[in-house]
C-alpha cells in the first residue's frame, strides 16, 4: 500500500515538473512573433488558456498531495448522553405528491433512539392544498408562505423562524434519506468542536442523463460521484467543504451566527456553507451515501440546473467577495475560488475545439516551432497528466470522460457564464423538474445539437484540408493540427450521439436491484 501511494506521489510530482517545463517552453519558444499581429494575438489567447488549465491541474494535484482523501471515521452514537431534538426540513415548490411521499416515508423511517424527537416539516413554497393534505395524511408538519422571496433559502429561513430544535437536517423533495442518516451525522457534533454541518453524498435511483443517453448504465459512475467522493472528501483538510443544499445536518447555532441561509445568489447552498465556515465552524464531508434521489431525465431541466449552479457561483463571488471575506484562510478562499473558476470550462473547451481550425482551414500559425522538439516536450507531459489523473481517481472519473462531459455542456454554459460574469445577472430561481415524460426533442436540446453539429462539420473540414495539404507540403507542418482535429471530432461525435438520444424515461421504470461498484444501486429497466 505504501509503494502504491509512493508511486502516485511520484507521478504527481513528475507531472507537475513536466507541466512547468512545457509552459516555459511554450512561452519562450513557440509564439509566432514574426508572423503578424493576428497570429500572435490568437497564439497568446491559446497559450493563456493552456496556462489557465495548468493552474487548475496544479491546484488539483497539490490538493491530492497535501490532503488525506479518506472519509472521516464515524464516531459511535453512544457518545451522546442526552438525545437532542432534530428538525427535518423537506423543501418543495412544485414537485408532485408522489415524489414527496417517498421522501417523507424515508424521513419517518430514519433510525433514532427517540423518534418523538424527530420533527419533520414539509416546507412548501408553492402553498398548495394538496401538499398540506398529504402532510396531514402522513402525520408530519406543514409550513408554507404567501411569497417566494429568496426562493429555497427564503423557504428554509421561514422554517427556521417557526422551529426551535438545536439541529436541522435539510433534504430536497426527491432526496429520500437512508435509515442511518441521523446516526451517521449527529455524533460528529459531540465528538469534535465547532462543527457547523455534516454533508453526505447523494446517489440516485435512476441513471443520470449521461449514463442513460450514452447507454452506459452501470458502466460509468454517476457524473456527480467525482465531486462527492473525491473533491469533497479532500476539502475536509482545508475546512472548505461545500454545502450542497440537501443531505446535510446543521447545528442551529451555526446558522444563527451566519444569519440564516444565505440569500441573494442562485447558489444559496454553497454560499451558506462558506459563511458558516467563515464564522469559525467546521464543515465535514463523508463518503457514505446519505440519500437516494431522482436524476434529471430531460435535457432542458438539466441545462437549467447547471446554468443555475454556474451563475450562482459567479453571483456568490461578486456578492461575498470571496478573496476578501473575513474569517476564511487563504486556502479556504482559494478552494471556494476554484468552485467558481470551474464553471468557466466551457470557454476554455470552445477555444480548444476551434483552435486547430485556425491553421488547417485558414492557414494561421499559432504555434511556431520545430515539430520534433514540440512533440518531445508536449507528448510526455500530456500522457503523464492523463495517466496521473486516471490512476488517482480510479473508476470515479477518467480524463476522457471529463472531456466528453465538458464538450456536451460547452454550448449550454459558455456564453451564459460569460454573460453573468460581465454583469447580465439571472435572478429567477428555476426549480429543477425531476420526472417528465416527453418524447419530442426539446428546444434547448435542438440548440445544443446545432452547436455540436456545426463544430463537428468545421472539424471534419479542417481534418480533410489537413490531409489534402499534406500532398503539397511536408506532413510535419500539419501533424499537430491533424491529431488535435481528430481528437475534437471524437468528442463532438459522442456529444452528437448524446443529443440525438433525446427520449426521456420515467424514473419509476427503474427499480433498486443490488449493490454495484459504481452507482451503489444497480438498476434494471422494467419490461412493459
Enumerate the language-model features and the residues they cover.
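A conserved acidic beta->alpha catalytic loop
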Residues: 123-131, 147-148
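Catalytic donor-sugar/metal-binding loop of nucleotide-sugar-dependent glycosyltransferases
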Residues: 264, 273-291
Amino acid at each position: 500500500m505504501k509503494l502504491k501511494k509512493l508511486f502516485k506521489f511520484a507521478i504527481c510530482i513528475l507531472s507537475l515538473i513536466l507541466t512547468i517545463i512545457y509552459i516555459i517552453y511554450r512561452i519562450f519558444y513557440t509564439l509566432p512573433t514574426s508572423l503578424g499581429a493576428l497570429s500572435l494575438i490568437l497564439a497568446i489567447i491559446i497559450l493563456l488558456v493552456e496556462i489557465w488549465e495548468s493552474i487548475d491541474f496544479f491546484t488539483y494535484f497539490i490538493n491530492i498531495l497535501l490532503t488525506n482523501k479518506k472519509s472521516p471515521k464515524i464516531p459511535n452514537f453512544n457518545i451522546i448522553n442526552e438525545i437532542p431534538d432534530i428538525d427535518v426540513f423537506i423543501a418543495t415548490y412544485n414537485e408532485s405528491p408522489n415524489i414527496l411521499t417517498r421522501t417523507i416515508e424515508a424521513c419517518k423511517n430514519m433510525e433514532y433512539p427517540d423518534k418523538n424527537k424527530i420533527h419533520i416539516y414539509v416546507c412548501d413554497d408553492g402553498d398548495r392544498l394538496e401538499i398540506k393534505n398529504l402532510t396531514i395524511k402522513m402525520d408530519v408538519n406543514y409550513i408554507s408562505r404567501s411569497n417566494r422571496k429568496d426562493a429555497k433559502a427564503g423557504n428554509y429561513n421561514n422554517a427556521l423562524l417557526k422551529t426551535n430544535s438545536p439541529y436541522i437536517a435539510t433534504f430536497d423533495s426527491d432526496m429520500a434519506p437512508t435509515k442511518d442518516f441521523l446516526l451517521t451525522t449527529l455524533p460528529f457534533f459531540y465528538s469534535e468542536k465547532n462543527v457547523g454541518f455534516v454533508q453526505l453524498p447523494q446517489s440516485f435511483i435512476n441513471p443520470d442523463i449521461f449514463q442513460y443517453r450514452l447507454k452506459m448504465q452501470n458502466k460509468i459512475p454517476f457524473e456527480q460521484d467525482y465531486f462527492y467522493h473525491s473533491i469533497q472528501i479532500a476539502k475536509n483538510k482545508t475546512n472548505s467543504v461545500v454545502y450542497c443544499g440537501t443531505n446535510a445536518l446543521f447545528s442551529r447555532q451555526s446558522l444563527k451566527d451566519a444569519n440564516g441561509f444565505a440569500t441573494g445568489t442562485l447558489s444559496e447552498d454553497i454560499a451558506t456553507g462558506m459563511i458558516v465556515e467563515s464564522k469559525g465552524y467546521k464543515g465535514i464531508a463523508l463518503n457514505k451515501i446519505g440519500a437516494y434521489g431522482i436524476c434529471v431525465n430531460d435535457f432542458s431541466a438539466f441545462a437549467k440546473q447547471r446554468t443555475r449552479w454556474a451563475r450562482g457561483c459567479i453571483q456568490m463571488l461578486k456578492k461575498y467577495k470571496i478573496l476578501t471575506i473575513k474569517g476564511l484562510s487563504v486556502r479556504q478562499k482559494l478552494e471556494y475560488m476554484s468552485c467558481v473558476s470551474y464553471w468557466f470550462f466551457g470557454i476554455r473547451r470552445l477555444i480548444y475545439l476551434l483552435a486547430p481550425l485556425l491553421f488547417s482551414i485558414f492557414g494561421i500559425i499559432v504555434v511556431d516551432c520545430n515539430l520534433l522538439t514540440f512533440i518531445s516536450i508536449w507528448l510526455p507531459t500530456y500522457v503523464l497528466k492523463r495517466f496521473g489523473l486516471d490512476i488517482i481517481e480510479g473508476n470515479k472519473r477518467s480524463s476522457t470522460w471529463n472531456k466528453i462531459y465538458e464538450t456536451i455542456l460547452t454550448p449550454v454554459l459558455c456564453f451564459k457564464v460569460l454573460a453573468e460574469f460581465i454583469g447580465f445577472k439571472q435572478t429567477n430561481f428555476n426549480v429543477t423538474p425531476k420526472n417528465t415524460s416527453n418524447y419530442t426533442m426539446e428546444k434547448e436540446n435542438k440548440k445544443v445539437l446545432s452547436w455540436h453539429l456545426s463544430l463537428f462539420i468545421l472539424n471534419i473540414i479542417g481534418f480533410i484540408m489537413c490531409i489534402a495539404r499534406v500532398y503539397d507540403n511536408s506532413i510535419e507542418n500539419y501533424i499537430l493540427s491533424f491529431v488535435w482535429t481528430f481528437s475534437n471530432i471524437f468528442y463532438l461525435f459522442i456529444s452528437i450521439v448524446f443529443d440525438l438520444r433525446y427520449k426521456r424515461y420515467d424514473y419509476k421504470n427503474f427499480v433498486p436491484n443490488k449493490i454495484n461498484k459504481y452507482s451503489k444501486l444497480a438498476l434494471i429497466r422494467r419490461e412493459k
